[in-house]
């Protein structure tokens, strides 16, 4: 595409050219009146042009001037119209390499160097998105061993800008960054899903009925097998959501804070055995019956009545399905971890905090906890920014999510929309991937929308052809001059040379593959791409406080409690739920294979409560 030229400049230049043309027209008019014949007219015109003082107004001067004023603009218009469709030197593309130092001068915060993101060795990116009109969402792509943590995550964490959430496989970031962040006055909280240390209770953040239903959906959707997509599975999922949301709403409105946790939830499910005898009520039915007598429109009652529309056999199967969704809470350590909360998610937008979520790199069983935390963090921060008038819709402290292992943790269903609007709330996301294939697998047809909501892409290297091909394509084509030569042999030999233009990718896929290990490729919206050195971690002034430069690592004490809270788990909630029996699983399996027995006594009534996806 041809760069847009300033048409005003062109028009001014053509207008200035009109002045000598009008003078020449007036001179020609005078010459035609003074002389006869072409030779004499030419001689007279030459004399007048060489001596402008001799120019005089004559009878034919207006005609000549009018002709110029009509024909000249018409000629200029035709010429500009013709040139508009020509792209000299850019017939095949205008892609070209940018300069890292030029890019840095444009986007850095020179007055406050600490208020910059570190992209490459020579490029800094100001956190003031209003100054450069770019969002702060960044996609980082790099294969295993390309240095995503060393060359990008750690240097940016050491900038100590605002609050951070880290997904931390194996706990490396916690050990490296925890001590310096505490030293610099940043509150450090760790949720360790490897050693089950720290405490996070999703029920601590329930404020509305919608929050409770959303949490129930998150539990069911993130604890089922990834390949569970059949219609029967949807039936069980929706039914489980009805039951779990009813129980969560009951705890939210009726239980003390110490009992609002997953252990109590599991305990309630296991005390809801449905009998074939309709005259026999289980403890849970009695509990909700008492609540209904007090308030028939209680949200928990409405959800529970929707669940109870099912046939007895079906209800028992749904109970088993719901218990299966919560089976991990049978673990004493996991039940204890979720018994109370010390994450204090809204505070991340009010004061500098660092939250490390330590994940096992070889087991994704408990990664759904990170998913729920993601969902609730976005909800809490958006709500805080939007509901506090003095914040004007933006959090006072910037919150940055460093989403390593992005592909291994399920995301909120509306993540694409969150990414599009988080900038206005002073939130940014660093999406860290191994290759483009991971993004395509996660978002199917919407994967390009994720990249579209990130104004910066940093490629650190890898060994996946699809990524090479994608990058080569978006880098564009340049126009090259080629020289062709032909030589004719024989008694009358001849040769000819010709210059032509041809298009070539700015960087071919194989050239991207051969990038040096210490180089990276940076693409920013509206800017030419840059190849620069990866940032050297040892050049950062704060690295001396980390184990990478001989500093002391951060070690979580065995009795780690984070920001200690006073609530304790109720005796009922502390009880370890019994294991789900093999007989219960067999019954559920039988009903899944015989869907004709899975029915609600009143399908029309049930349909109005179907929550859908």
Where are these regions (language model features)?
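Basic- and hydrophobic-enriched, low-structure N-terminal and domain-boundary segments
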Residues: 1-146, 150-152, 477, 488-489, ...
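P-loop NTPase motor domains
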Residues: 23-26, 134-427, 442, 452, ...
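A broad, low-specificity signal for short, low-complexity segments enriched in glycine/proline
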Residues: 96-105, 114-115, 119-130, 150-151, ...
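Flexible domain-boundary/linker segments
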Residues: 261, 339, 390-391, 439, ...
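Short loop or secondary-structure boundary microenvironments that flank
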Residues: 359, 363, 405, 433, ...
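Conserved ATP-driven motor cores of ASCE-family P-loop NTPases powering translocation/secretion/packaging/pilus
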Residues: 419-521
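Extended alpha-helical interface modules used as scaffolds for assembling large macromolecular complexes
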Residues: 505, 544-547
């Amino acid at each position: 595409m041809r760069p847009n030229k300033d048409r005003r400049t062109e028009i001014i230049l053509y207008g200035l050219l009109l002045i000598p043309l009008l003078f020449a027209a007036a001179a020609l008019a005078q010459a035609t009146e003074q002389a006869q014949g072409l030779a004499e007219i030419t001689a007279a015109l030459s004399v007048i042009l060489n001596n402008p003082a001799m120019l005089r107004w004559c009878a034919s001067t207006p005609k000549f001037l009018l002709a110029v004023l009509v024909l000249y603009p018409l000629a200029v218009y035709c010429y500009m119209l013709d040139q508009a469709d020509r792209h000299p030197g850019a017939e095949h593309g205008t892609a070209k390499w940018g300069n890292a130092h030029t890019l840095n001068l444009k986007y850095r915060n020179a007055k406050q160097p600490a208020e910059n993101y570190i992209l490459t060795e020579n490029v800094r990116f100001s956190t003031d998105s209003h100054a450069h009109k770019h969002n702060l969402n960044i996609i980082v792509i790099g294969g295993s061993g390309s240095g995503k943590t060393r060359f990008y995550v750690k240097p940016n964490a050491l900038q100590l800008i605002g609050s951070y959430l880290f997904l931390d496989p194996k706990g490396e970031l916690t050990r490296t960054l925890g001590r310096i962040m505490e030293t610099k006055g940043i509150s450090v909280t760790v949720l360790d899903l490897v050693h089950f240390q720290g405490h996070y209770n999703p029920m601590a953040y329930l404020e509305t009925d919608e929050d409770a239903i959303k949490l129930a959906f998150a539990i069911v959707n993130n604890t089922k097998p990834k390949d569970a997509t059949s219609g029967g599975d949807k039936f069980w999922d929706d039914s489980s959501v009805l039951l779990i949301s009813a129980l969560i709403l009951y705890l939210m409105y009726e239980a003390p804070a110490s009992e609002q946790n997953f252990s109590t939830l599991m305990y309630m499910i296991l005390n809801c055995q449905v009998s074939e005898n309709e005259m026999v009520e289980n403890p849970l039915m009695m509990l909700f019956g008492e609540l209904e007598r007090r308030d028939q429109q209680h949200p928990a009652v409405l959800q529970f009545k929707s669940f109870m529309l099912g046939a007895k056999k079906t209800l028992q199967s749904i109970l088993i399905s719901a218990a299966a969704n919560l089976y991990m809470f049978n673990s004493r350590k996991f039940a204890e971890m979720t018994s109370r909360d010390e994450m204090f998610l809204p505070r991340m937008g009010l004061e500098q905090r660092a939250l490390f979520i330590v994940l096992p790199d070889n087991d994704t069983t408990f990664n759904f906890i990170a998913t729920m935390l993601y969902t609730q963090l976005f909800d809490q921060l958006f709500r805080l920014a939007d509901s506090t008038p003095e914040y004007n819709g933006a959090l006072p402290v910037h919150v940055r999510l460093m989403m390593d292992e992005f592909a291994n943790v399920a995301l909120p269903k509306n993540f694409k929309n969150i990414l599009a609007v988080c900038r206005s709330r002073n939130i940014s996301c660093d999406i860290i991937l191994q290759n483009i294939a991971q993004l395509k697998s996660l978002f199917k047809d919407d994967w390009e929308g994720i990249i579209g909501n990130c104004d910066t892409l940093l490629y650190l290297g890898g060994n996946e052809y699809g990524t090479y091909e994608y990058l080569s394509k978006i880098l564009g084509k340049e126009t090259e001059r080629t020289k062709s030569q032909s030589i004719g042999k024989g008694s009358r030999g001849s040769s000819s040379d010709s210059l032509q233009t041809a298009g070539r990718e700015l960087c071919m896929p194989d050239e991207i593959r051969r990038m040096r290990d210490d180089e990276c490729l940076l693409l920013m919206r509206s800017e030419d791409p840059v190849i620069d050195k990866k940032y050297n971690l040892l050049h950062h002034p704060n690295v001396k406080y980390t184990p990478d430069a001989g500093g002391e690592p951060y070690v979580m004490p065995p009795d780690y409690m984070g920001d200690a809270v006073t609530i304790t788990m109720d005796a009922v909630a502390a009880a370890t739920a019994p294991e789900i029996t093999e007989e219960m699983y067999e019954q559920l399996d039988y009903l899944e294979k015989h869907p004709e027995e899975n029915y609600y006594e009143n399908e029309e009534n049930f349909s109005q409560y179907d929550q859908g996806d």
